Amino acid sequence: MHYAMEQRCLYDYNLSELTELLQSWGEPAFRARQLYRHLYVNLARQVDQMTDLPLALRSRLAEIPFSTLRCEQVQIGDNGMTRKALFRLPDGAVVETVLMVYPDRSTVCVSTQAGCGMGCVFCATGQLGLLRNLSSGEIVAQAIWASQELRAMGMAGPTGRVSNLVFMGMGEPFANYDRWWQAVERLHDPQGFNLGARSMTVSTVGLVKGIERLANERLPINLAISLHAPDDALRSELMPVNRRYPIADLMAATRNYIAKTRRRVSFEYVLLQGKNDHPHQAIALARLLRHSAPRGPLLFHVNLIPWNPVPGTPLGRSEWERVTTFQQILTDYGIPCTVRVERGVEIAAACGQLAGRHSVPLNTVEQEIPARNVTG
């Protein structure tokens, strides 16, 4: 989809582009490195905080926004350890970002599109349809916001930023591949945000061409694939993308990815009561993965996800006994399997619940705090 915004923001520039911009203004290259450090290491909220830059340069930089994201609402759940931000974009589109804090780490769940065009029936974002792709700067700004929140909470740790990032928010990353990958490279850059590649995970509904591209990238970020069914008939019902990329094609791309990268692949499987959680479906899933695995150590992992309620859908959440039975069957077949720890359900921030709206009843929210923009 065509990117609707015309003006570039500071987070849209990599270091080379910032250098070129500032040199076109008559500034030496080292000024760009100083600016880059303020943006990605110091996490400056305002140009006025960049006191080592000349006043004239700061005045000129003040004419360029850091980001287009405007935070309209932040909701808090899980006793303060989960925060969901709703950002408004200049064209009226909205996206959501979720920060989850644990005793030993922090994870931000980032959106790559406003809405989503994949149409998965169990996902709130899929009901919105695709509004537009995000720019690389709009993706990056979400990680900056999360790190600024951590610092405000006094929980940023020695790195001063989030420790993990998952591209599992609104949208399909591989449908916005170029801008998404630009964001990955900027967040990984050791001269800036310096987030390790293996601390980032991208989730896809199974766009085969995207998996093939990722296999050839230089950064070994983690890959998660939304599977959700062991056969084409059911997967096509739940995920329309399967009609274009059926399971056989998806598994072939996955085998090729593992052969090239020797990296483990996670398969996400949301459990729906009476739909895809029967014992025979667990057996079928185990056999599918065993049959599809390349030779050598099994580099597959299944992440079972109890479905989180989405208004307007006839689906139901699997009973816990069915979840544990499903997990045990996979384990018995030698498939590594875990059940995802739930976070943010009460503020509609959990897996599949992001819908970019204010309509969460406030009596389900532990606390609502005033919004803060990424730039102050």
UniProtKB/Swiss-Prot annotation:
GO terms for biological process: rRNA base methylation; tRNA methylation. Its main location: cytoplasm. It catalyses: adenosine(2503) in 23S rRNA + 2 reduced [2Fe-2S]-[ferredoxin] + 2 S-adenosyl-L-methionine = 2-methyladenosine(2503) in 23S rRNA + 5'-deoxyadenosine + L-methionine + 2 oxidized [2Fe-2S]-[ferredoxin] + S-adenosyl-L-homocysteine; adenosine(37) in tRNA + 2 reduced [2Fe-2S]-[ferredoxin] + 2 S-adenosyl-L-methionine = 2-methyladenosine(37) in tRNA + 5'-deoxyadenosine + L-methionine + 2 oxidized [2Fe-2S]-[ferredoxin] + S-adenosyl-L-homocysteine. [4Fe-4S] cluster binds at residues 116, 120, 123. Its EC number is 2.1.1.192. PROSITE patterns: RADICAL_SAM (PS51918). Disulfide bonds join 109-351. It is an enzyme of class 2 (transferase). S-adenosyl-L-methionine binds at residues 171-172, 203, 226-228, 308. The active site is at residues 96, 351. Belongs to the radical SAM superfamily. RlmN family. This is Probable dual-specificity RNA methyltransferase RlmN. The lineage of its organism: Bacteria, Bacillati, Chloroflexota, Chloroflexia, Chloroflexales.
